[in-house]
Amino acid sequence: MAPKAKIVLVGSGMIGGVMATLIVQKNLGDVVLFDIVKNMPHGKALDTSHTNVMAYSNCKVSGSNTYDDLAGADVVIVTAGFTKAPGKSDKEWNRDDLLPLNNKIMIEIGGHIKKNCPNAFIIVVTNPVDVMVQLLHQHSGVPKNKIIGLGGVLDTSRLKYYISQKLNVCPRDVNAHIVGAHGNKMVLLKRYITVGGIPLQEFINNKLISDAELEAIFDRTVNTALEIVNLHASPYVAPAAAIIEMAESYLKDLKKVLICSTLLEGQYGHSDIFGGTPVVLGANGVEQVIELQLNSEEKAKFDEAIAETKRMKALA
């Protein structure tokens, strides 16, 4: 019998806690919750371990304050980093402020991955994710197919949900693509949206949703994180679920087509930069990078997204 997968969560905050719970519920493997905060990951691990009973699972869940526990990891999920600039109010900071802070963290984590688990599959969540995933790729030395960033899986889940609520259909029946980057420059591809396999344009033609309503949904999708923050909360449940969907496709060799931040090597006319596009995730990691045939307007927006990633990368 093959041993359980070892999944290390580097960062045991809100997202890390939900991910650990989902891993146990799905019986995906043994979990190590790592954090630099003393004792906290151990407490979360103990609490989470009790859910094995209700989940009919048998996953070991442990806490750690040492990078040595990365040793032998099959999957490493990195959420560690600053989510806002220290000493600045919500109105005073932007994502540029995070770059030098989280850059240092990616360099540190990358060195420990290289030392302890160079064959692991890496999922990066730390923002700005399209920049951070490239930094971690460079400093960890893992192959290009073994590292991706969160983005499109989360962004499209929001878009699909909003459209489903307007049309009163099952959210899972909505299919959509958001590419380019995770952030304000994300590219929402209207002509790729389908509902139950039917092009969304048919629903527009039948006056079940208007172009204006769709644009409002697009705007809400782009600004969802801010909307949640303004409601005095933070987004962590849906991000955790999106990440675990990615990890599960790798661990179970499901070969799901998911939109992730991956290394572009000529796709869309860009190279040596991470960007969001559909990929096939299986036991070999990124097994295919799918390049969509964008029209001129879509391509221009994609180029803007990559240009913004390059601008931030230069600041890091």
Curated annotation (Swiss-Prot):
It catalyses: (S)-lactate + NAD(+) = pyruvate + NADH + H(+). The active site is at residue 182. NAD(+) binds at residues 14-150. GO terms for molecular function: L-lactate dehydrogenase activity. GO terms for biological process: lactate metabolic process. It comes from the Eukaryota. This is L-lactate dehydrogenase. The lineage of its organism: Eukaryota, Sar, Alveolata, Apicomplexa, Aconoidasida.
